[in-house]
Amino acid sequence: MRVTPLISTALVLAVSGSLFAQEWVEFASRDDRFTCNFPVQPKVTEIIYRSQHEADLPARVYSATQGQSRYSVTVVDYNQAQRILTEKAKSCPKGAETCLGAVGDEGHWKADIRGAMDYASWQLMKRDAKLTLFVWGVVDLVEGRQMQLTNADKSRTFAGIYMHENKLYIIEGTVPAGYPEPGLFQQSLGWLDENGVSIRYQTYYSNGFPPPPRARRAPAAQSPGRIDAPGAVVNPVQR
């Protein structure tokens, strides 16, 4: 007789969890070549992001809220770093190596790109928060940094920082004290190619090095959680 209430409770929890998941939006950006789940359609804000070597780079922030929880993906286009820092180096004082850079690395644009993830990590560490985790990690085999911080108001921020095709991705989910970590948000980040098609690599991807071969696409029913951008056309070779 005691089994029935337990089964009913389990069913209620399962249905509630399913309904909660269904409320989230599977978002895809062809412009910034990523996919991610948000609680609602994210707001898109264009900003300027100043890099370590002071290049003012174009960036977008995709943000959404659910109650007291906040979610965002910031995408910074480091493909512009070479042009911006090379031009900036032309006006550097004579002999100012930290500004001039070197031949082929004017304005230290190469270092700016290579150090982008660490610089972004440092910006998070400087917040009024206690760092509780800082590790190397991957999302769909694209390497990056993963962080957890406890903020001054006891809320917790779960962050991931990744670099793909010279674009920096800073993903942050902040939840009130006592709330579970935002796994539905964190684990949904994915990558798109130039045609808006979801991609995954066969082994680790490190920005700045030749990309590894891509994994063969499994049928949709076998690879849940990864979507293509609207209107994407999948090449038969990718299937």
Briefly describe each language-model feature range.
Residues M1-A10:
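Bacterial N-terminal signal peptides that target proteins for export
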Residues L19-W24:
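Boundary at the C-terminal end of the N-terminal hydrophobic targeting segment
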Residues A28-R30, P39, T45, T65, ...:
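A structural detector for beta-sheet-dominated domains
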Residues N37-Q41, Q66-Q68, L141-V142, Y162-Y169:
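Short, solvent-exposed coil/turn segments at beta-strand boundaries
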Residues R30-P58:
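N-terminal targeting signals for Sec/Tat export/insertion, comprising classic cleavable signal peptides
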Residues R30, F34, P42-K43, S91-T98, ...:
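Surface-exposed amphipathic alpha-helical segments
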Residues R50-G160, D228-R239:
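Conserved polar/disulfide-associated segments of primarily extracytoplasmic proteins
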